[in-house]
Amino acid sequence: RRWPGTAPLSEPESQFLHAQMDEFRPQLVVSIHAPYGVLDFDGPHEPPQRLGRLRLDRVGVFPGSLGHYGGVQQGMPVVTIELDHALRMPRDAEVRSMWDDLLRWMDVRLLKEGPPGQAKK
């Protein structure tokens, strides 16, 4: 479902998110979505290959999407966790596995390597 607004940043939720990203400048944006059951990634850095049982499967970057804005235009990595179902959360053990994998990836890619283009510490 892609229901774009009438113009870029015309929707209040988009305006809010844009302001937060512009002010805070996060090192990583994590988006939770459904229903593809994959891991998506946009932006700099080598992407995580998996989070829990979700495997990397880049679904593409769409103009106006969070991945396009954050990952392509702003250079902020965007990890999108695509759950299997919008109304059914994974079990606690699976959620823990996803977060553990994400934290390991962040430690290597964001903390040790630093921003893209910088030398490793």
Where are these regions (language model features)?
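Active-site/substrate-binding loop(s) of hydrolase catalytic cores
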Residues: 1-60, 68, 90
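Active-site-adjacent mobile loop/cap segments within catalytic or ligand-binding domains
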Residues: 39-42, 48-50, 60-120
